[in-house]
């Protein structure tokens, strides 16, 4: 389940007890992985959800929203990954919601996260700018543990890279 941290699945902040109850009920009814993010990359807004997922016996994937600006550097993303891992995240996910992360940045970021952390690193991108498959190949070369793909009717464009294309690329 994609969980917006303190916003749960909406666009307003909820009290900790509401977040905890929502996660507990979701886990009770079969959700076993929570991919938890905050739209402004503030780990404080993810802490309650991570703690609640762990308490419910589910996996908590701490998610870094990839963006570009003078303050969004590889080091700031690694620092955030470390903070999420320290909160108990079972994995770190690089979430490139706009499909703009270039392959060379992917290589650098995945390598840095893998070097600094002892938990799996995943990547999620969209093929919006046509970079998805090459971004995933760079991530794989850097040691990423998992990539999100999509079946062909829903793939590419604003979707994730096509699973069949990735399979063909990886099988050489």
Regions found by a protein language model. Give the residues of each.
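Catalytic cores and adjacent flexible loops of soluble metabolic enzymes
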Residues: 1-35, 39-172
């Amino acid at each position: 389940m994609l969980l917006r941290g303190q916003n749960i699945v909406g666009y307003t902040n909820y009290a900790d007890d509401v977040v905890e109850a929502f996660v507990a009920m979701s886990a009770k009814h079969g959700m076993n992985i929570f991919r938890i993010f905050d739209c402004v990359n503030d780990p404080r807004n993810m802490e309650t959800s991570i703690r609640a997922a762990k308490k419910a016996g589910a996996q908590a994937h701490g998610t870094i929203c990839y963006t570009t600006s003078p303050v969004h550097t590889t080091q700031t993303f690694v620092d955030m990954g470390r903070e999420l891992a320290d909160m108990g995240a079972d994995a770190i996910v690089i979430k490139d919601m706009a499909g703009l992360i270039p392959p060379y940045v992917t290589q650098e970021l995945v390598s840095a996260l893998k070097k600094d952390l002892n938990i799996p690193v995943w990547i999620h991108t969209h093929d919006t700018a046509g970079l998805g498959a090459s971004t995933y190949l760079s991530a794989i070369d850097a040691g990423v543990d998992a990539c999100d793909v999509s079946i062909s009717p829903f793939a590419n464009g604003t979707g994730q890279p096509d699973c069949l294309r990735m399979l063909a690329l990886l099988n050489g």
